[in-house]
Amino acid sequence: MADALKKGSLIRVNREAYLSSVEAKASAGDPPAYLLEGPGEVLAVKGDYAQLRFRQPVPDIWLRMDQLEAYAGS
């Protein structure tokens, strides 16, 4: 599914993939709810990574594409 993601795609972070990642191990505590609930927007893609922006007053972040899934909405 991450292969279909491109600039402008709405995403959410896959809980299992993120929690077992190096990025999660380097972060303090549990991930914030907005990260796992979405939606976030893909701003750029470089190699295996995507730059993400969430509708929160937080900095943009880079995560591996295999940790992302398309946002289905609600």
From Swiss-Prot:
It is found in: Cellular thylakoid membrane. Its EC number is 7.1.1.-. It holds the Pfam family NdhO. This is NAD(P)H-quinone oxidoreductase subunit O. Its main location: membrane. Keywords: Membrane, NAD, NADP, Plastoquinone, Quinone, Thylakoid, Translocase, Transport. NDH-1 can be composed of about 15 different subunits; different subcomplexes with different compositions have been identified which probably have different functions. GO terms for molecular function: oxidoreductase activity, acting on NAD(P)H, quinone or similar compound as acceptor; quinone binding. It catalyses: a plastoquinone + NADH + (n+1) H(+)(in) = a plastoquinol + NAD(+) + n H(+)(out); a plastoquinone + NADPH + (n+1) H(+)(in) = a plastoquinol + NADP(+) + n H(+)(out). NDH-1 shuttles electrons from an unknown electron donor, via FMN and iron-sulfur (Fe-S) centers, to quinones in the respiratory and/or the photosynthetic chain. The immediate electron acceptor for the enzyme in this species is believed to be plastoquinone. Couples the redox reaction to proton translocation, and thus conserves the redox energy in a proton gradient. Cyanobacterial NDH-1 also plays a role in inorganic carbon-concentration. Belongs to the complex I NdhO subunit family. GO terms for cellular component: plasma membrane-derived thylakoid membrane. InterPro entries: NdhO (IPR020905). It is a peripheral membrane protein.
